[in-house]
Amino acid sequence: MTIIVDYRFPPAINAEKQAKTIAIGQTAGTWSERHSHRQKQLQQHLAEVVGIREEADGYKVARVRFPQINVENDIASLLTMIFGKYSMAGAGKVVGVYLPESYGTKAKLGITGIRQRLGVYDRPLVMAIFKPALGLSAQDHADILREVAFAGLDVIKDDEIMADLPVAPTHERLDCCRRVLEEVRQQTGRNVLYAVNVTGKADELQRKARLLVKHGANALLLNVLTYGFSVLEALASDPAIDVPIFAHPAFAGAMCAGSDTGLAYSVVLGTMMAHAGADAVLYPAAYGSLPFDPQEEGKIRDILRDRNVFPVPSAGIRPGIVPQVLGDYGRNVILNAGTGIMDHPSGPASGVRAFFEALARIEAGESFDPANLPEGALKQAILEWG
């Protein structure tokens, strides 16, 4: 079996030469007469340039086919092979990686499993982020959770910046919030997921994740790119961690934002996350608060859903843009809002209600023009943010 990788080069770069350099340098490392007696042995490890196409802007995309026998069925050895030291060679960007279906680690729960845990099958999920990100006590987290959970929220997560800090230690947050989740379940029959941020040193992370689950965590959050894909793979393949893992994109810009260097967002937040075991992946929405290419967003969405992974467009999601989100995503999406819920003029519970009002109006085919909206949470949100 093989792995296909697309590299994009600017007009000033000799794409043919660079593609051949990658095919040899990122596999056998050398291919000269001095090693002719080993050619048969080395041949099976060599990559092959299978095509080069020129785009309208003069850029060229070279396609290279790598033997799968060169890697260990994980993301770390894959990234080392396809881009490794070549990532320091100058202009050239990985814009597509095509892996066998069986490659890597599959989501343990994904879209279908998360919906089953929540008992919600016929609509997008609504998710919030604890805000302010830092400075809240464990009890503050529980008080906020109570407000939004009883308003109908499906999922809430720690802010990715919230580590295991003295102001609100992770197990204290979980303990306080777990009691609220049980209240909600007993009084409403609904389950709400709380994705607890897993942080720490490499030798502690899996133990800490297992302990969180043992103590009642029903979802986990992981900053995959700062802790490493290997951590995600380890958590996702651990039978003791039977809860969904929400993958955060923090640090992705350092790998992906360069126009002619690094890897495309769709490769890192789409392909790699989907083959490393994430159940849901957060990433910027093109219509949100961070600049993001709509084409890349669409690729990420499709790559994730092809592997049963929940897409979670984020950063600047607010009730007034729900029609745009659903137009692009349909119902299999998680609407993730931080300030779009927590900073609602009438409070976080109204922020949650505004999203559900938006979903109801879309279902009924009704206008979002403020002049046609009844007084309530949605109208307030649209007047506040558009």
Curated annotation (Swiss-Prot):
Write down how the cofactor binds this protein.
Binds 1 Mg(2+) ion per subunit.
Cofactor(s) listed: Mg(2+)
Query: What EC number(s) is this enzyme filed under?
Result: 5.3.2.5
- What InterPro entries does the annotation carry? Diketo-Methiopentyl-P_enolase (IPR017717), RuBisCO (IPR033966), RuBisCO_lsu_C (IPR000685), RuBisCO_lsu_C_sf (IPR036376), RuBisCO_lsu_fd_N (IPR017443), RuBisCO_lsu_N_sf (IPR036422)
Q: What class of enzyme is it?
A: isomerase
Sorted alphabetically, the keyword list is: Amino-acid biosynthesis, Isomerase, Magnesium, Metal-binding, Methionine biosynthesis
Highest taxon above the source species: Bacteria
Listed under GO biological process in this entry are:
carbon fixation; L-methionine salvage from methylthioadenosine
GO MF, any single term: 2,3-diketo-5-methylthiopentyl-1-phosphate enolase activity
Output the Pfam families linked to this UniProt entry. RuBisCO_large, RuBisCO_large_N
Task: Tell me if Amino-acid biosynthesis is a UniProt keyword of this record.
Answer: yes
Query: Catalysed reaction per UniProt?
Result: 5-methylsulfanyl-2,3-dioxopentyl phosphate = 2-hydroxy-5-methylsulfanyl-3-oxopent-1-enyl phosphate
Q: Which amino acid positions bind substrate, per UniProt? A: 131, 157-160, 248, 316, 338-339
Instruction: Tell me which residues bind Mg(2+).
Output: 157, 159-160
Protein name as it appears in the record: 2,3-diketo-5-methylthiopentyl-1-phosphate enolase
Q: Which organism is it from?
A: Microcystis aeruginosa
Taxonomy, top ranks, is: Bacteria, Bacillati, Cyanobacteriota, Cyanophyceae, Oscillatoriophycideae
Gene assigned in the entry: mtnW
